[in-house]
Curated annotation (Swiss-Prot):
Name assigned to this protein: Phosphoribosylformylglycinamidine synthase
Binding locations of ATP: G308, A309, A310, T311, G312, A313, G314, G315, E316, I317, R318, D319, A675, S885
Family, similarity comment: In the N-terminal section; belongs to the FGAMS family.
Stored Pfam families: AIRS_C, FGAR-AT_linker, FGAR-AT_N, FGAR-AT_PurM_N-like, GATase_5
Catalysed reactions, semicolon-separated: N(2)-formyl-N(1)-(5-phospho-beta-D-ribosyl)glycinamide + L-glutamine + ATP + H2O = 2-formamido-N(1)-(5-O-phospho-beta-D-ribosyl)acetamidine + L-glutamate + ADP + phosphate + H(+)
Organism, as annotated: Methylobacillus flagellatus (strain ATCC 51484 / DSM 6875 / VKM B-1610 / KT)
BP terms from Gene Ontology: 'de novo' IMP biosynthetic process
Name of the gene this protein is made from: purL
GO MF entries: ATP binding; metal ion binding; phosphoribosylformylglycinamidine synthase activity
Amino acid sequence: MISLRGSAALSPFRIEKILAALKGSAPRITHLYAEFWHFAWSDQPLSEAQQEVLKQILTYGPRMSEEAPAGELFLVIPRPGTISPWSSRATDIARHCGIEAIQRLERGIAFYAATADGSPLTDAEKAALRPLIHDRMTEAVFASLTDAQKLYHTAEPAPLSTVDILSGGKAALEAANAEMGLALSPDEVDYLIENFQRMGRNPTDVELMMFAQANSEHCRHKIFNADWVIDGVAQAQSLFGMIRNTHKLNPGKTVVAYADNASIVEGGKTKRFYPLADGQYGFVEEDMHFLMKVETHNHPTAISPFAGAATGAGGEIRDEGATGSGSKPKAGLTGFSVSNLHIPGFKQPWEHNNGKPDRIASALQIMVDGPLGGAAYNNEFGRPNIAGYFRTLEIESAGEIRGYHKPIMLAGGVGNISARHAKKNPIPPGAALIQLGGPAMLIGLGGGAASSMDTGANTENLDFDSVQRGNPELERRAQEVIDRCWQLGDKNPILSIHDVGAGGISNAFPELVNDAGVGARFQLRDVHNEEPGMSPREIWSNEAQERYVMAVRKEDLPLFAEICERERCPFAVVGEATEEKRLVVSDRHFGNTPVDMDLSVLLGKPPKMTRDVQHVARELPAFDHSRIDLKEAAQRVLRLPGVADKTFLITIGDRSVTGMIARDQMVGPWQVPVADVAVTLDGFETYRGEAFAIGEKAPLALIDAPASGRMAIGEAITNIAASLIEDIADLKLSANWMAPAGHPGEDAALFDTVKAVGMELCPQLGISIPVGKDSMSMKTVWEERNEKKAVTAPISLVVTAFAPTADARKTLTPQLRTDLGDTRLLLIDLGAGRNRLGGSALAQVYGSVGNVAPDVEDADSLKHFFNAVQKLNREGRLLAYHDRSDGGLFATVVEMAFAGRTGLELDIASLGEDAVAVLYNEELGAVLQVRAADLDAITAELETTLRGKVHVIGAPASHGDIVIRQGTKLVFAESRVALHRAWSETTYQMQKLRDNPVCAQQEYDRLLDERDAGLHAKLTFDINENIAAPYIASGARPKMAILREQGVNGQVEMAAAFDRAGFNAFDVHMSDIISGRVSLKDFAGFVACGGFSYGDVLGAGEGWAKSILFNPRARDEFTAFFNRTDSFALGVCNGCQMMSNLHSIIPGAGHWPHFVRNRSEQFEARVAMVEVLDSPSLFFNGMAGSRMPIAVAHGEGYAEFADAAAQQRAQDARLVTLRYVDNSGLPTEVYPFNPNGSPQGITGLTTADGRFSIMMPHPERVFRTVQHSWHPDGWGEDGPWIRMFRNARKFIG
């Protein structure tokens, strides 16, 4: 083992946070220092030259002050027996840099803790420090650097074992059931005993684990398929049968329902843009459908929030890629329901400490780490996350604590699939059965069974085993392979594909072949495996992530292998399909057969469950709101996380990657997160796309579970109504059902809710639910001081509505317009004046639930509402729109005011006499902004179908206050700024806790600046002029290399921008250059694209750069290219970071900075204002002096120059091309106007001759106007950033 000391690992503010956390438990620890250590293992000694290269590879990141270690050592390394994603990526980089002997690189952090007087730490002090410096699920703490050797332990393979039921009978299997955490029901134990006794042999542990996973509640949805007896009466339908009823009645435009990894909905002819067989990008017109899927990953997120949420997102992404015979994930959504946060120093009056078991994370920890995990996975994979929800609930109801100690972690999204690939093909006997993606690793074992149990019912070690770890960069590589396959059209080598999820390949391979009506033979030792010490059971059933299984014809294997080799994606042929419907797994190492059984035994019909349950009546007190003060109510409600500003959850997630996003969460010139709907685009030459929106009203279930289901659907519809949809029948719903099955009364309430949705409301609305998921163990049980405790979730239906949208430009937002003359606000009150407060945010912040819930009494009114909004939008008569939901009418109107930075004058007299109920009820409805001149006509039109439900409630005001009257009586007045600060305080507190507190404070204080003009555009060129037109007309299209490395994800939108500007864009992978397949001499220019090359290990872009600098062929290629006189290049984001590290071989780039971690120490996805500076850059010719918004998405964008002199020389030589400015146009280092803190706002540079330029923001994601989150009225099809690409075409001539 080679040990190499690295740089300081933690910034001062991170160290301070740890020391502050120790003040209560270990105040004597007054000093802490952390530094990286790297450990390398090789199969032969490294030469001196190789050792020098290794040292340079492992020198990365920002400059931070280092110190001599002092104090007691705590070495934090990955848990022995695991391989971290960092390790696999860093090892790849070393090998690509020519150090082939490297077997593994790993990284640890050495913490040195000291007391003021230098005395040794006590055991209690050590115990207090350890949980603050490591994640016990993924890391371990040791006391010596030599302990890192434990990471590289090669064990002999563990043997197969059997369970002796032939002599031990049922008792033997029951003991194994408990010991292995199989979660088998008594009926399933009997079923297995019967079948194996019939076979005359004992089952292997491999077969039992495989059976348990394949037949777990998680995988087989036993409760949803069960027979039901309620209050002694047998029910005619199962829960799933009632859901299927919606599709049976309204199957229109649904291509696949309930039969694949995602549901497929009919699309239309679309021009898709991708690289063709020769590598050149082009448009291909084909029939393209969209697919929809929403999953949950609740149990793993409770145990290890970052990893659990990350792999939840990753698993759902795989579902979208493994549909049909290969598909493309496109855009995502994320949601969280947790118990109360208890933010330190920000305790809220409705929060009470009900305790929690030690084994699970607190709600606060889940909301600090979980969203980061989900966002990090989406970001690195390259899927924009553009919708979500966040709910907290922990309250006493009917003598019980109801809440989300077991959280909901929702992950979903949309994708696209070619019509020709929508169905899985037959698998002929002899076809190769392939595992694509990462290796088997001992993680996630038994996750399917574990997630089917109540939290706390499993043993702690098994809970640890059932959590997975994610490597999104590897999943990206696997998706690139899938993309190359489906892009071959009819020559797609993939016959059928499944993702590997719960149960690992022991579930995925049987599903793959069983669905095709064939069997299979496998060789266990051909499974790609990096932990040779695993037992056969562990190899077959582990839930290592980033894996797919697929069938490929033998004759297509060479083509498939060629694609995988180019994408550097591991794959293994593990078996072949057989005519006999039998599953056989052989093990050549031990010479035995761990699995040999008919598929009908594994996946046949184990005994069907019967649920015999009772209704339970609960006495619920009314919510007494008679003494509530409206000002206090506003302050409380606006701080409730379900209502409050969710910026801290949104800006950590990339929302612009792909260039296919028309509407994300952030709205208007001030980027306020209040959008009702997410909208994507179908391509780069269309305005058609997909819309999706979430509905969720779980607290109502504590009063009336069926009402909560109806209201969730209603909310999804009132949200998605903000997009332009041709017909309500085009809506397709995903239903995610969470329930504490077995809790008194809850099963019957679940049945009633499914019936209300599946048999009544959806049929009345004419819409269907073709996809969904259930999680039936939403209860946490534990013991505390010998007292049994429990926190039980309410029945929770999360509905996601999806639909094709006819024109993404017609999406309405809540931003009130104050620049379009005299306007009015209309409320459409679908509650028809009932003003019920049960289950509301208001009730919750006063510690109550109430006993009367809002409901959907009239499906026709909901349909009329939807149709009316669509008609008015189509006709251009609506200026703003926002649905009424959490926080009631009050939250609706103040959010609209926040987005428009305006005051309001409202009169609520027509809505009822009870001002509290009027303002805070959460009945369905929406507020519309219309022109005053249109008011009478629109009101009359709405009244024809919504009689008595339409109210004029006021108008935007020229002052800065929110003023609400009831006729002549003033009932509420407060400044918009004060309310906005209250609404944003929760997000500020979370950012302050999680990120750099200085940045959090700057963003929060931005709200105080009433002169902030917001995003704007000041252009010094004609946006409508196409300066490349003459050159395009000549017919000449220069060749442009669209360069990517493994983990890059922004290449397609970059190619589209250069294609539009008159280039022929070619897909060039670094593997093409290193292998000699492609040479840069054949291209006029190249662009290095954005993403996460090598997952940003060894510094963002640095691994990519070093694989060029230390690979002789690559270095020669790039050096020759840069030294040509006619070449040019652009580096954006990750490509910018990479090229900045090549400055030694780029003429004129000597003063370029190094790009390091953002000052916030967080990934920042923002719309930022930039100014183009006067420079020699060919890309910015004629643009100097322009100011305009641009997409930003990076974690390491701080421009770190060698020294102040180098920065000054770069500026003096006019090498700085772009800088961040604030909303008044001044260069800035203030967050978030400058999202990374770069000195003087510097974010783009060029060389002395202007041919090579680098920039951190993303012009390729916003070259069309429709791609902008906000833009001025009047821009046409092209946005201003297309000028950059056209300048490059003009440069060539």
